[in-house]
A protein has these predicted regions:
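G-domain G4 guanine-recognition motif of GTPases
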Residues: 14, 31, 164-165, 189-204, ...
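Phosphate-binding loop that captures ATP/GTP phosphates
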Residues: 11, 60-102, 224
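NTP-binding/hydrolysis catalytic cores, primarily Walker-type P-loop NTPases
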Residues: 4, 242-295
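Extreme N-terminal, non-catalytic leader segments
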Residues: 1-35, 46-47, 88
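Hydrophobic positions on the alpha1 helix immediately C-terminal to the Walker A/P-loop
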Residues: 40
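Conserved Switch II/interswitch segment of TRAFAC-class P-loop GTPases
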Residues: 142-145, 156-174, 199-202
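Cytosolic-facing regulatory segments adjacent to core modules
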Residues: 104-151
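Beta-strand-loop-alpha "switch" segments that mediate conformational coupling across diverse proteins
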Residues: 216-247, 255-258
Length: 295
């Protein structure tokens, strides 16, 4: 993956870097497992829905531990079942709390570049015809360290990195940002700190991280805010529900609402698009990445 030649990497950056989605597509990533990425995705989705947005979560988990599970939903199929004719693409979509829609695509989708050209074209056409009117897509990405997962993650208009405290977590998040910037030309990132003890701690970590990334990688890291250490959030996770619904006066609920309010003011992409157009870009990215791997 990291051994692309210059022409191949440039082609992939060109394909995945276009701001063509029109609506907001935000990939939620982390540098390590257990950072709280999935819980952040699920709770942000509910907070956005309560703010009047139509939200779709694309859940890439193939272990049943993604955003669908965090919202109490049980996927019965994934994209591989669609290709096998066991269900339709529309039938994959689950409806969660506050009408948040979840599309559980499964881990097999990350290997879409290895599908036959016929299956790729059919899948792209199916996504184009998908009846899913949304204006915010949150991608709960499986593993940012998995090269096969990258087309889905990189076709977004925004990348949000979830960072818990600790030197190891900071180092791994920095490595993730470095890889995405140097290999794929990503220049802007959003930073959400998780399990933070105080606003002062959050400001210090965010400031140091952003300064280091700007100095050594020449990238911009915008600090979004923080989610506090909150036992009610942990309890909501165990209950497979959102803290926004279960504990409306919890500290973490307040922070998710602030985060959603801030996201509503983010600049909108210049051109219009839809879920189908976004997923077509993902499929094209997977095809090119597989070609690069073989070449």
């Amino acid at each position: 993956m990291d051994k692309f030649n210059c022409d191949q990497a440039a082609g992939l950056r060109s394909l995945l870097g276009l701001g063509q989605a029109g609506f907001q597509v935000i990939t939620v990533m982390s540098g390590q497992q257990g950072a709280g990425k999935t819980a952040a995705t699920a709770n942000l989705a509910v907070a956005l829905a309560r703010g009047g947005r139509d939200v779709l979560i694309i859940d890439q988990s193939h272990k049943g531990q993604g955003a669908a599970a965090a919202l109490g939903l049980t996927p019965r199929h994934d994209v591989m079942d669609v290709l096998a004719g066991r269900c339709t693409l529309d039938a994959l979509i689950l409806t969660g709390p506050d009408n948040v829609q979840v599309l559980p695509i499964g881990g097999g989708f990350s290997r879409l570049g290895r599908l036959s050209e016929r299956d790729q074209e059919w899948l792209a056409k199916s996504f184009t015809q998908l009846q899913c009117g949304v204006d915010v897509v949150l991608v709960d990405m499986e593993e940012a360290t998995d090269p096969d997962a990258l087309p889905l993650g990189l076709a977004a208009s925004e990348i949000m990195v979830v960072l818990p405290p600790g030197n190891t977590a900071i180092t791994q998040a920095y490595t993730l940002v470095k890889r995405l910037s140097q290999n794929f030309g990503k220049r802007q990132f959003r930073l959400l700190l998780n399990r933070i003890e105080s606003p002062e701690q959050a400001q210090a970590v965010a400031h140091n991280f952003a300064q280091t990334a700007e100095r050594y990688l020449s990238v911009s890291v915008d600090y979004l805010g923080y989610i506090p250490l909150d036992e009610r959030l942990n309890r909501a996770n165990r209950l497979r529900t959102s803290v926004v619904d279960a504990f409306p006066v919890a500290q973490s609920t307040s922070q998710f609402r602030k985060l959603a309010d801030g996201l509503l003011r983010w600049p909108q992409p210049a051109s219009l698009g839809n879920v189908g157009g976004f997923m077509q870009r993902v499929i094209e990215g997977g095809r090119l990445m597989e070609s690069c791997r073989r070449g």
